[in-house]
Amino acid sequence: IEIKLGGDDGALAFVPGSFTVAAGEKIVFKNNAGFPHNIVFDEDEVPAGVDASKISMSEEDLLNAPGETYAVTLSEKGTYSFYCSPHQGAGMVGKVTVQ
């Protein structure tokens, strides 16, 4: 599944903001608009036993250009919340459910 970082209208959002994948399915986050974005999983909102730092980008690491991607594969079932650290305050947050 491919998730856009930034709406086609320039919105600071993940598109779609909430989605479901199968365990082991690759998720590709793709910069859509050229604003600097990243993907950080919230350590308090991932399934028990999952190390959020191992599936997140570094807070300082950014996808700056349109078309740049970050891929992650989640194997533990459950719900994961994530955000873009530069734009979290603007509501750029998302959620993925792994089945």
Swiss-Prot record:
GO molecular function terms attached to this record: copper ion binding; electron transporter, transferring electrons from cytochrome b6/f complex of photosystem II activity
SUPFAM superfamilies, sorted: Cupredoxins
Record's function text: Participates in electron transfer between P700 and the cytochrome b6-f complex in photosystem I.
Domain Plastocyanin-like: 1-99
Compartments (UniProt record): Plastid, Chloroplast thylakoid membrane
Cellular component annotations (GO), alphabetically ordered: chloroplast thylakoid lumen; chloroplast thylakoid membrane
Keyword list, A-Z: Chloroplast, Copper, Electron transport, Membrane, Metal-binding, Plastid, Thylakoid, Transport
UniProt name for this protein: Plastocyanin
Species this protein is from: Rumex obtusifolius
